[in-house]
Swiss-Prot record:
Highest taxon above the source species: Eukaryota
CC per GO annotation: mitochondrion; nucleus
Protein name as it appears in the record: Peptidyl-prolyl cis-trans isomerase E
Free-text activity regulation comment from the record: Inhibited by cyclosporin A.
Substrates-to-products reaction catalysed: [protein]-peptidylproline (omega=180) = [protein]-peptidylproline (omega=0)
Amino acid sequence: MAASNFPHNKKRTLYVGGFGEEVTEKVLMAAFITFGDIVAISIPMDYETGKHRGFGFVEFELAEDAAAAIDNMNESELFGRTIRCNFARPPKATERSSRPVWADDEWLKRYGKGSGIADAKESNGSASTAKGLPRVYLGVKIGIRYIGRIVIELRSDVVPRTAENFRCLCTGEKGFGYEGSSFHRIIPKFMLQGGDFTKGDGTGGKSIYGPKFEDENFKLKHLMPGTVSMANCGPNTNGSQFFICAEKTDWLDGKHVVFGHVVEGMNVVRQVEQQGTPSGKPQMVVKIVECGELDPVPQTEPQENEENSDPQTPMDVEPQKETA
């Protein structure tokens, strides 16, 4: 989305930094549109290299939407990199014009903090080129209305067995899988759970390795909305059920195996979340009507999101059901 010529508004314009070369204005739009109407997006280019500088600007129509975006997106993960999201600093009053703030080279030098790509490498450690992680999609219907696809990148570099289980259940190559199953448990501001393709109520499902398989590791954490993790009914009871986090859920760290994150379709996740209730029973039937594998996108290797944190007490749940 091209930037329009509007004056900078410090309460509506966000600085987003630290993302990798694969991020485009379209990607930023998809990541931030869930918080409200967007006026303009711009990613300044380095005309010497022909590449962007690893940061950009997003202006919202409403100040409260901009604030919500900061609350949810600052220090979140985008294509495997931890990004920063704050209000953009305005230029001096004497420098104001009809141009957007990011069109001012002096502003970029002073407040752009150089290359956001370099910042990302510093925060994530050394970045090495990867062949690309597997990506799968879930096409979702609410009632009779198709609302779109959720695209998930699988962390086969950290949890290969868990990632392969989910990939195969998306493709159906083992003769069974997620197509036609539902999100049977949806709790707003927490998570949406699905993957029970045998019973549909949270008591069924199976993995490609047998009824259950062991917890692979807990290196990846529940740090942000869009995190995808295995549901279970205790240690080493992973099957096919999974959940997508609607918010940061760090009390689940060390109890559930994180194996991926949503890279496209968070707007679909939010629409599904709206069908939830405090009890978890969806207001309408939410089904996965199509699923499969996409071509991987070559990119810089994502960080593993390892953190040392003390898990909090998990929610009380019915023991016979797999839960988040």
